[in-house]
Design a protein with these regions (language model features):
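Conserved, mostly hydrophobic/aromatic
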Residues: 204, 224, 241, 277, ...
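Short flexible coil/turn linkers enriched for glycine and charged/polar residues
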Residues: 187-190, 200-202, 299, 309, ...
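Flexible glycine-/small-residue-rich
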Residues: 52, 279, 307-309, 430-432, ...
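Contiguous mid-protein beta-loop-alpha structural module that forms a pocket-lining wall or clamp
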Residues: 354, 361, 369-371
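Conserved SAM/AdoMet-binding glycine-rich loop
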Residues: 116-121, 130, 233-356, 367
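Terminal RNA-binding accessory module
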Residues: 10-13, 389-482
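Radical SAM enzyme [4Fe-4S]-AdoMet core and its adjacent flexible, acidic
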Residues: 55, 250-267, 271, 318, ...
């Protein structure tokens, strides 16, 4: 829970402090002072629209930026146009970049009508030099551009832009320090993500993440535990431990700590009910972690274990550092200790050089592991990655046919697994009012499956026994057991 008293106690007379996070507190207060004057000038409260693309870590970053802007004096609106529009970008797939350019085109005319409007871009796409140069040349109406390493400097960058009345572009190649003690606005009051590390050292040949998120950097376990205790005191019952590869946690610390050890420490926090984590790289998932998952009673019965391909040959080209056989052996060890564990995965179809035999290996793993669900993707060429320069790009029609076959296989298995616990009564965390039917609530099982059931909004945030009355393939219809 953020200490606003510490923020309010800081003086903004004189020069800005050099140390963080005090420097950012200074600029948050300076911006707040400006926002009061701006509100009087334009004759209405300042509004903001924050749109987030990509992963859970981007969502967590957006929570921080939302809270900073709210403190400054902006009110969040649902509309895509506001006095301050911020896009927190993703660049894992080329389509995400194209989406941003489309939205910028839409905003251009609105900015002409409202010169006081400010447009900001941050996140992974901004770490790509070519994209930033394109924005500089063709989208000069954008006011703020910053990357993944200085998200925490939002207030300082905004104040610089306000004072100079010129675009500010500040993208760092690497992180200089980890700054976490900033406000955050949780989407749900009862659950949230907690960053335990940043960056990635794996350099999978198709992936741009290490280039845009930087090398691995772990937070000190004491800081993580302290943050979670504060969140629990503020009503949080479930945390998601976040990192590009949580299994590598602690390796860069002065006093190394394993992720399994951290998990055991988090499990001891009084008042916390559920622990989730993502993402896990198979090559780093240790027997120590398998033991910890089985023994820690608060760890949810769900593991996301990206496969990407079932072909050892393709995995080698992907630089995944495991084989089909070692992956299946890992799953066997996991299931031996955690027989009720739900496994989900990521699979890429159409990686350069993928043959029919390679694809059949992927289907073979899917059938043997029997994933509860899978995120399936058609390979997307990312400029700057080794895979983009590989020969033997798979024809589009072949990829589409394979993708459909994979989807059919995954969906069939998923429906069978979901049907398997139909009729059981299980603990469910009530998350929200159903978006399709206001008379229903939506909740999540420990295994990450979703169930919809009749109930009152006052139950949101509670963990209740719910009977899974009917399986609908990818979700359940249920009823509260009283």
């Amino acid at each position: 829970m953020f200490d606003y008293e510490r923020l309010e106690a800081l003086s903004i007379e004189g020069e800005a402090p050099q140390s963080e996070p005090e420097r950012q507190y200074y600029f948050m207060k300076k911006c707040r002072q400006w926002a009061e004057e701006e509100k009087e000038r334009i004759g209405h409260p300042l509004t903001m629209s924050i749109q987030t693309l990509g992963c859970q870590m981007n969502a967590k970053d957006s929570e921080k930026m939302t809270a900073i802007l709210e403190y400054i004096g902006y009110k969040e609106v649902e509309e895509p146009v506001a006095d301050f529009v911020l896009y927190n970008t993703c660049t894992v797939r080329e389509n995400a970049n194209l989406k941003i350019y489309g939205r910028l085109g839409y905003l251009k005319n609105h900015k002409k009508k409202n010169p006081s409007m400010r447009i900001a871009l941050c996140g992974c796409m901004m770490q790509e030099v070519d994209e930033v140069e394109r924005i500089r040349k063709s989208y000069s109406f954008v006011d703020l551009v910053f990357g993944t390493h200085n998200i925490y400097k939002l207030a300082e960058l905004l104040y610089t832009q306000v004072q100079s009345a010129r675009p500010v572009m500040d993208v760092w190649k690497e992180a200089k320090e980890i700054v976490e003690d900033l406000p955050g606005k949780r989407k749900y009051p009862f659950k949230t993500g907690v960053n335990i590390m940043y960056g990635c050292n794996n350099f999978c040949s198709y992936c741009i993440v290490p280039y845009v998120r930087g090398r691995e950097r772990s937070r000190e376990p004491e800081d993580i535990i302290s943050e979670i205790k504060g969140l629990v005191a503020d009503g949080v019952v479930e945390v998601m431990l976040l990192g590009q590869n949580v299994n590598s946690y602690g390796k860069t610390l002065e006093n190394p700590v394993t992720f399994a050890n951290l998990l055991r420490q988090v499990n001891e926090i009084e008042g916390l009910k559920r622990i989730r984590f993502m993402t896990s790289h198979p090559k780093d998932l240790s027997d120590e972690l398998i033991e910890a998952m089985a023994e820690c009673d608060k760890v949810c019965t769900h593991l996301h274990l990206p496969l990407q391909s079932g072909s050892t040959e393709i995995l080698k080209k992907m630089n995944r550092k495991y084989t089909k056989e070692s992956y299946l052996s890992l799953v066997e060890r996991i299931r031996e200790k955690n027989p009720k564990l739900s496994l989900t995965t990521d699979i890429i179809v159409g990686f350069p050089g993928e043959t029919e035999e390679d694809f059949e290996d992927t289907l073979d793993v899917v059938r043997k592991v029997r994933y509860d669900s899978a995120y399936t993707f058609i390979y997307s060429k990312r400029t700057g990655t080794p895979a983009a320069a590989m020969e033997n790009q798979v024809p589009e029609e072949v990829v589409k046919e394979r993708f459909d076959r994979l989807l059919h296989e995954v969906q069939g298995i998923s429906a069978e697994i979901t049907k398997g616990i139909e009729g059981e009564t299980v603990p469910v965390l009530v998350e929200e009012i159903n978006t399709q039917n206001e008379e229903l609530l939506t909740g999540r099982l420990s295994n990450n499956a979703v169930v919809h059931f009749p109930g009152d909004a006052s139950l949101i945030g509670e963990i209740l026994p719910v009977k899974l009355v009917e399986s609908k393939g990818f979700y359940y219809m249920g009823e509260i057991v009283k």
